[in-house]
UniProtKB/Swiss-Prot annotation:
Localization per record: Cytoplasm
Cofactor: Mn(2+); Mg(2+)
Predominant place of localization: cytoplasm
Pfam families the UniProt entry points to: RNase_HII (PF01351)
Uppermost EC category: hydrolase
A GO molecular-function annotation: manganese ion binding
GO cellular component: cytoplasm; ribonuclease H2 complex
Disulfide-linked positions: none
Protein name as catalogued: Ribonuclease HII
Organism listed in the record: Nitrosomonas eutropha (strain DSM 101675 / C91 / Nm57)
């Protein structure tokens, strides 16, 4: 049903989609193929928003899956590698800063989620479980799960992949715009970041639709 070695294009690069279920409070519906979806990067003032979709392998348990925000950077990186190696399928997608400013951050997040799900071409009995209260428009059965990144292993895994992919992108952007400190705050509105915006203006990777950036000139 799923094959290892499929290629996923992400921001002009190719990533490998290789072929866990950790049961917590969530009981998986019988006869459904579960696809977990989550996003990363709704709150920052800069950078794209990322999303991931993950199908876990019930024959391989990945220990320690949790909401990515509750994990250390080192632990997230380790789990991300395990997910990529042992999940039945996974995909990562993003929506650009331009799309965020044009659509708004919620709709851009939904767009990134939709792209990640579509990459996997879900089977007919798929159930797409999405963290939070909003779900993307898809031609599949979709269900929102509040605190899903803490309750559903597939969503936890998606949270980890989305977060690590976005953090890697912010480190790349730090090399281009080092004075903003993206390597430390990943684009979030910390005092260091806000001070840098006040001193230097904004960059092409800042979200002009977000209030702290709206009236600043671009460097």
């Amino acid at each position: 049903m799923y094959c290892s070695g499929h290629l996923i294009r992400l921001a002009g690069r190719l990533e490998i989609k290789t072929s866990g279920v950790v049961v917590r409070e969530w009981i998986h519906p019988e006869g459904k193929a579960i696809y977990g979806v989550d996003e990363a990067g709704r709150g920052p003032l800069a950078g794209p928003v990322y999303a991931a979709c993950v199908v876990l392998d019930s024959c391989y348990v990945i220990n320690g899956l949790a909401d990515s925000k509750q994990l250390s950077e080192k632990r997230r990186a380790s789990l991300a590698e395990q997910i990529k190696q042992h999940a039945r399928a996974w995909a990562i997608a993003s929506a650009s800063v331009e799309e965020i400013d044009r659509l708004n951050i919620l709709q851009a997040s939904m767009l990134a989620m939709r792209r990640a799900v579509i990459e996997l071409m879900p089977v007919s009995n798929a159930l797409i479980l999405v963290d939070g209260t909003h779900v993307p428009q898809l031609d599949y059965e979709v269900q929102a799960v509040i605190r899903g990144d803490s309750l559903v292993a597939e969503i936890s895994a998606a949270s980890i992949l989305a977060k690590t992919a976005r953090d890697a992108e912010m480190l790349r952007l730090h090399e281009i715009y080092p004075i903003y400190g993206f390597d430390r705050h990943k684009g979030y509105p910390t005092r260091v970041h806000l001070d840098a915006i006040r001193l230097h203006g904004i960059t092409a990777t800042h979200r002009k639709s977000f209030a702290p950036c709206a009236e600043k000139s671009t460097v």
